[in-house]
Structures are given as structure tokens and as C-alpha cells.
């Protein structure tokens, strides 16, 4: 995945 920390 490109953005691992999107909503974390």
C-alpha cells in the first residue's frame, strides 16, 4: 500500500 498511515 502507498499510504499506510492514512487514518491512524
Swiss-Prot record:
Localization: Secreted
Keywords for this protein: Amidation, Neuropeptide, Secreted
Superkingdom of this protein's organism: Eukaryota
Gene Ontology CC annotations of this record: extracellular region
GO biological process, one term: neuropeptide signaling pathway
Modification sites for Phenylalanine amide: 8
Family: Belongs to the FARP (FMRFamide related peptide) family.
Name listed for the protein in its UniProt record: FMRFamide-like neuropeptide FLP4
Annotated organism of origin: Macrobrachium rosenbergii
Amino acid at each position: 500500500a502507498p499510504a499506510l498511515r492514512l487514518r491512524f
